[in-house]
Amino acid sequence: MKFSLESNHKHARAGRLSVNNKTINTPAFMTIGTYGSVKTMDTFDLKKCNVEIILSNAFHLMLRPGTALIEKFGGLHQLMNWDGLILTDSGGYQVFSLGKDIKISDVGAEFRSPFNGDKVLMTPEISIDVQTKINTDIMMIFDECIKYPSNLSVTEKSMELSLRWAERSKKANYASKTLFGIVQGGMLSLIHI
């Protein structure tokens, strides 16, 4: 990964981010392709719109169409017929958005699949393994997402758990892919990390 600052003015900046010999201009708008496709658009349309990066979701892709199927295609790029950058979110927010029946522990998050009701365990290691197997360019650590507003005690406890999960995500990165962290500390800037 390489980042170069191209220009800056006061609090603004423009740069270029290169990962896996693919480069995007920053700041960048990430087009959403949660399940590995952008609704109503094919890759030709995306290129016409100068899309440089697509955001997909490891949680959803793991559950449907499934990691094994994406691997059979040779990865998410081949499945999507996309040669630009792909960033996959780890699934922390999606677990949170399921609402009830979620068990969060040091191990990970246990929940029921929104598609078929099966019991699913998502851990930092599983999230990184999925993101590696689908061959994304930029992986996000698995973190806990908490409701807003949350008090200092809840926010600190979640931040500490997410930091432990971040360490495990980093250790699980066996393919040494580009791995990004997520700002922790909720809306309480005094504990942002």
Which sequence ranges carry the predicted segments?
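Conserved small/polar residues in nucleotide/adenosyl-binding loops
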Residues: 191-193
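Non-catalytic, usually N-terminal nucleic-acid engagement modules in DNA/RNA processing proteins
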Residues: 1-174
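Intrinsically disordered, low-complexity segments enriched in small residues
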Residues: 139-141, 174-188
